[in-house]
């Protein structure tokens, strides 16, 4: 025994029951009752009609006991070695006291400042040597003399 399903309401249609509606594009619609056929022809939305299967599915009626709550897995953080830092080194750095870490940071900053200062001084001395070797550069415009603006004769 083949049981069909109503195209509008989703109800079961047993053999010998219901009607068929064939649309112009040859799509077949089966209706269990004239009520569902009428509502279909009025272009009603079955999701908005309370007694249809689609309405019940859309508004989550009568399926609460079937669906079990999905369990979410909690992520666990794990320490891993990174390129350029082994796991032991990372653990050692983490275990340092904040005061010690601050002192190390200040020391590193000071060393970097000194290095930057030394680099700057070296570059400056090198630039001075080059300037002394070449002599002073004078552009053609400077050699000609500054442009003299003509004084206006009218008042």
From Swiss-Prot:
Pfam families: Ribosomal_L24e
Key words of the record: Ribonucleoprotein, Ribosomal protein
Location of the region described as Disordered in the Swiss-Prot/TrEMBL record: 94-155
GO CC terms in record: cytosolic large ribosomal subunit
Compositional bias of kind Basic and acidic residues: 94-129
SUPFAM superfamilies: Glucocorticoid receptor-like (DNA-binding domain)
InterPro entries: L24e/L24_sf, Ribosomal_eL24, Ribosomal_eL24-rel_N, Ribosomal_eL24_CS
Biological processes annotated in GO: cytoplasmic translation
GO terms assigned for molecular function: mRNA binding; structural constituent of ribosome
The family this protein is said to belong to: Belongs to the eukaryotic ribosomal protein eL24 family.
Descriptive protein name: Large ribosomal subunit protein eL24
Originating species: Kluyveromyces lactis (strain ATCC 8585 / CBS 2359 / DSM 70799 / NBRC 1267 / NRRL Y-1140 / WM37)
């Amino acid at each position: 025994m083949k049981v069909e399903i109503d195209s509008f309401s989703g109800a079961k249609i047993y053999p010998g029951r219901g009607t068929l509606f064939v649309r112009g594009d040859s799509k077949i619609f089966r209706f269990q009752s004239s009520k569902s056929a009428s509502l279909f022809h009025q272009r009603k939305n079955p999701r908005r009609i309370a007694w249809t299967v689609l309405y019940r599915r859309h508004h989550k009626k009568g399926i609460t006991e079937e669906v079990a709550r999905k369990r979410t897995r909690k992520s666990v953080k794990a320490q891993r070695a990174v390129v350029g830092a082994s796991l032991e080194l990372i653990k050692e750095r983490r275990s340092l006291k904040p005061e010690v870490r601050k002192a190390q940071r200040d020391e590193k900053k000071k060393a970097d400042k000194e290095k930057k200062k030394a680099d700057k001084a070296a570059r400056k001395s090198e630039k001075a040597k080059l300037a002394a070797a070449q002599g002073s550069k004078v552009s053609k415009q400077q050699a000609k003399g500054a442009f003299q603006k003509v004084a206006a004769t009218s008042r």
